[in-house]
């Protein structure tokens, strides 16, 4: 008889978040009494049947992480099970590498893998890509709702902006709509008012975000409503809803869209995002298609009163028109990361992990140690895992020997040195990808010749008051490669 594995805290929390009672009942059809439900026990039962498929439903568990986990926890699997998972991984990796909904010329056996042929016998895609595509295509294009705008409840700044008011109407009055806008355009403000107007129309509104980090960021800007992750909504859905608002929709992959499609029941949909931010992790770019097919309102005017030159620089990087007469009083150029930190940089953003490592070594506090020798009291740290106590990308500061706080009333206590080092990194230097969704007053950006326009745009627009460029820009930033849609 096989002994049940003792999973790490991070994996245990991941299992409990994903394999909720509602999930196993709705998705797997298991008949379990709610009062007797045990997520870990149920997970182990499912793993015994389908080790790869069960693990790969967890957050951040692709083929490689799943294979490592199966080996680490001594979970048996067959060669056939590994083959199926590996084929899926290889084909989807090829799709991501070639920025396409299809993979051309794959030679392996695709039977039972979730990979399917597309017309031509040498062109392949995934079942979830097909599902995502069909879901989008079957949504009503120009269907109107019976909602109306409660003008007396609209804030004056929004009423005074024709652009923002039209965006509000577009999302409230259309059954499927998009709201897009770059940094500083007031997208979150308008999103909050969309939710408010829908609730005034007595609608039950579900607000979703792709990650815990984006969920937290939006929650702070809403008047009303509670934000959930798409993952928790799909796997733990209970009760009816009238409207689904999806923030950071540019982070939707085909897999995530297909999961949404599996629980969709005709609700009004509002997609919100910045078309110039970084693409999703995973294959597919469904938000690009949605913008083309459904009523879309774009916010263009800069509403940020401070540091307009930073927003203008972000637009210049993208090749968009801006007011060339704006004084660049908030942008500084220095030669080294050390100089940037002396000018008050709270964080240095760069494409390379080597640059992140150097920034962390420069700024780390070399004072009273914390519970782990590599971290000191006063150090800024960033979570790199999701647990019940913190989420991936959440920023903290170590305040005592074994405690850190995030400045918003949340604290985490470390019971062992490894609980700190396994779940957190220093946060003086971050990759640009890791910074998306966060803002700081003073940001240093160290460009590289690997940066695309979108990477540079995201890095620049993380700064609210002061931007410090380290080493200067390359002659030109690379174009983000277009995604080829099915």
Label the model's feature ranges.
Residues 1-486:
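Conserved ATP-binding/catalytic motifs of P-loop helicase motor domains
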